[in-house]
């Protein structure tokens, strides 16, 4: 199993068979607390402990450990999850405090969804995480991407012991790669082969890493920089591990993927997989935390997309853009020099500065939207060039609990022309504050198990991030009738229309059997982009079935609950209290947000 930055807080891969498993397997449910479950999970996923900054004290031994990505390791994790479910049920039904019961109940929802996914013996089922995929390795999945990013961004090196732990994890990486390769071989035997265009992109990204000299690789240069003041030949040791272990393991994985490529077809959707329709139904349920069918999601996406385009049309006309479809006019606006950045490194620097400015502007406005504030500790960083080819435009998430590792807003700067001055503001609010980084810090105030399972509720997390974009507008960032203000409102509506369009193409690809070309053409017209410009997005949907649907489902539900509370409470409704309730309750199924709204109405 592999991890994204956010998923480090919410995914596990087994390295040990915990002592609780034999008792659970015999039908005896051992007495447990939510802290017991959290501690066990961290020992299954030591990288998560490091990312959270809690691999200290009793958990200090985890800093040099790595998760087990082999078939046996994944099977152990599955066994642990199945064993944890009755233990959590006992906590919910037992005499404990309300906070522990709620945390256990939320964790139950996450673990049950993951356990349902184990019925499909291929790909990667996240354990209370959002990144489910039918392919073990792809252009945006695999330790070839995640391990360098983790070691560089999250593994601290302040002491000799820290540096040795870094070396230990680097030395364990070949075993992780080989574990993934073994699962790729097993999936090949099941007929699970990624689309040809996905394999081409994946092998291309791997070749970028493989083509570097060991001394220049991120995971070597990062250690050399971090350990500069610590006596030892750290860089030389890392280079030897890379040359003797990592590169041969990467070669073995690439060789297996090349075998996959000889068998690959262009079919893009999950429907082609063993039990493909059932797999997609599960993936859609995992992503939305609802029972919406593909047809319902598809229809809702079309409806919302049309509504946002009607609003965009009015703004475009006010800006003098009156001819052609909304998509065609947005393509024209994308080239307007008033809203573009320079090419090359100059434009990349401009974009980073622009984002920092938007963060500085929104920060003092946030007390208007919340009674309870968090730090909003965020750093803006470029996605590594080797990852950019298969990465989305941006992503973000919180840092460590103690704040020593900041939250990150990762921005794809492969081509500065992909970003404009009217779409970057709303993207910033989505990924940084008051979006993912902001929400993640509230989630870290929960009991530890609640923090760990938060990644399992994509509809809430992404719904909140879209709601954060909405909050920014409500806080006045687009007030006024200047061209810049109108363009900013247009960027926000375009973001919403973009997420509505995702619902259409995701269900189109996986349920309606759209080809990649049909999905790209529809999406390009719907979003005002080019076919080339939307290709990475479409390819992402191909390998993460259902995930793209959670955004608007979650955003719509949060707004539905807000309107319900306003109608029921009248003058008692408190805007800031509602926002506190939604974000302070942590990442959870949408049904829990509805329950919390009921309590707010009745209070």
Where are these regions (language model features)?
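N-terminal maturation segment of proteins
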Residues: 26-603
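N-terminal export signals
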Residues: 7-26
